[in-house]
Regions:
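A charged N-terminal "starter" segment
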Residues: 1-130, 134-136, 174, 178, ...
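Electropositive phosphate-/nucleotide-binding environments in soluble metabolic enzymes
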Residues: 27-34, 55, 59, 74-77, ...
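Conserved, mostly hydrophobic/aromatic
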Residues: 33, 54, 76, 108, ...
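Structural preference for beta-strand elements that scaffold enzyme active sites
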Residues: 48-50, 69-71, 90-94, 113-115, ...
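Active-site-proximal loop/turn and secondary-structure-junction residues that shape catalytic pockets
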Residues: 55-57, 78, 99-101, 118-120, ...
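Conserved residues at the C-terminal ends of beta-strands
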Residues: 96, 117, 185, 224, ...
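Active-site loop/helix belt of alpha/beta enzymes
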Residues: 146-284, 393-395
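Charged (often Lys/Glu-rich) extended helix/loop segments that serve as interaction or gating elements
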Residues: 258-412
Length: 412
């Protein structure tokens, strides 16, 4: 397994303090989040970056991202309301998700830029705007004719096919709506700067094609996310300097042709992901047939993905299970460490649910632990609490805390 890089002495001290009163919890590092957020804004000065609220909507974390100048990538009406509560303006909030209900559309029509996911959804937004007696600008989520790495695109549940979008825009019959921009997202977790640069180039070329249609008033292009964080010991951090250079070379000429078009990128899990940790307490220790088990608090129900990664690896017969973001990012995506030193031993870490599936690591080497000792799981700052089945067995939900730069702990 990985060594526990990133949990500095401040974080370890905060975790040890919380373990006096909590059996399991999420701990987010404000300094780490801000550092990574600023790395993004420095690298893409010509783009507005949207924080992907679905990655981690914990209010103190979302507030940090707002303070760093990020807008919001919202995937629900509730996330739109969260962004508004943080003080974000309508132009900074993009609501892009398939299957928006009429209720969702009515509630958010004047709070965010709605990005229509289908022709039917355009009609529903038109109906809502007509009912309110207003005219609104919207975006269109486009399913490109190309794939992420070039070549022909594949069928998708997301967006309007590029060819269909061109037809719609050349025969626009929605008098209360103006198509003002596009949103594209084809892949999460890409570590290749060259692959991302090619994707950006293809999206901007497509934006030019759509910008030449009758109805499109191209005022924004949202290129989605894709910038990966390391989720395997062999992964290297994305070289943002290389990506910055490639993006600038594309953005400059595009802005020359479309002076009013604003470029957006989505942050995905980049800022909070490596800056979050799940800490759980050893509740019991037992030996069965010579095998050591540590029973910990709130493991599978508190942080699902490590247990899910083990299940996928165990039951996949190929030995190379396909990634399925954000649920499965690889078998070695979550480094495990302890808050104490000691003689090494081989242990299996399980949770306290009444299911044999509640195992997060099997036969790993850790310092010998006793009841009450803490175990730390990394890469828990994004798609962690939001994806976990807290209601399982009616156990207590793990709390979340932000370790502020001042040293204070903030919860909700």
């Amino acid at each position: 397994m990985w060594s526990m890089e990133g949990m500095n002495e401040r974080l370890k001290a905060a975790a040890a303090k919380l373990l006096l009163t909590e059996d399991c919890f999420y701990l987010y590092d404000e300094a780490g989040i801000r550092s990574r957020a600023r790395a993004l804004t420095r690298s893409f000065p010509s783009a507005k970056i949207l924080y992907s609220l679905k990655a981690n909507p914990f209010l103190p974390v979302a507030r940090v991202m707002k303070e760093e100048g990020f807008g919001a990538d919202a995937a629900s009406a509730a996330e739109v309301r969260l962004a508004v509560s943080l003080g974000m303006m309508k132009e900074e909030i993009q609501y892009s998700a398939p299957g928006k209900r009429a209720k969702d559309i009515r509630e958010t029509l004047e709070l965010a830029t709605l990005v229509a996911d289908s022709a039917g959804e355009i009609a529903r937004i038109e109906e809502a705007a007509k009912g309110k007696g207003i005219h609104v600008s919207i975006g269109l989520r486009i399913h490109p004719s190309f794939g992420f790495a070039g070549g022909r695109g594949e069928p998708s549940k997301f967006g309007i096919d590029e060819e269909e979008a061109i037809t719609l825009l050349n025969d626009w019959h929605f008098p209360h709506l103006s198509p003002a921009g596009i949103h594209v997202h084809l892949k999460s977790q890409e570590l290749s700067e060259e692959a991302l640069a090619l994707y950006y180039e293809n999206v901007l070329l497509m934006a030019e094609r759509l910008g030449r249609t009758e109805a499109m008033e191209l005022s924004f292009v949202n290129l989605g996310s894709g910038i990966e964080i390391p989720m395997d010991p062999e992964d290297e951090e994305m070289d943002l300097a290389l990506l910055e250079k490639a993006f600038a070379a594309l953005a400059g000429p595009f802005h020359d042709r479309f002076l009013k078009a604003r470029l957006f990128l989505e942050s995905g899990r980049y800022a909070p992901g490596p800056s979050g940790f799940y800490v759980t307490k050893a509740l019991d220790r037992k030996v069965s047939e010579g095998k050591v088990f540590l029973i910990t608090a709130g493991t599978m129900h508190g942080f699902l993905r490590p247990a899910l990664a083990r299940l996928v690896e165990k039951y996949d017969e190929t030995g190379h299970p396909a990634l399925c973001e954000p649920l499965f990012s690889g078998a070695r995506a979550f480094p495990i460490s302890t808050l104490r030193e000691g003689n090494p031993e081989t242990v299996t870490i399980t949770g306290n649910l009444c299911t044999a599936a509640d195992i997060i690591a099997e036969d790993i080497t850790l310092p010998r632990l006793a009841e009450g000792d803490g175990i730390v799981i990394g890469n828990a700052g994004a798609y962690a609490a939001t994806l976990s089945p807290f209601a399982f067995s009616s156990l207590e939900r793990p709390k979340e805390f932000l370790l502020k730069e001042t040293g204070d702990l903030e919860g909700v």
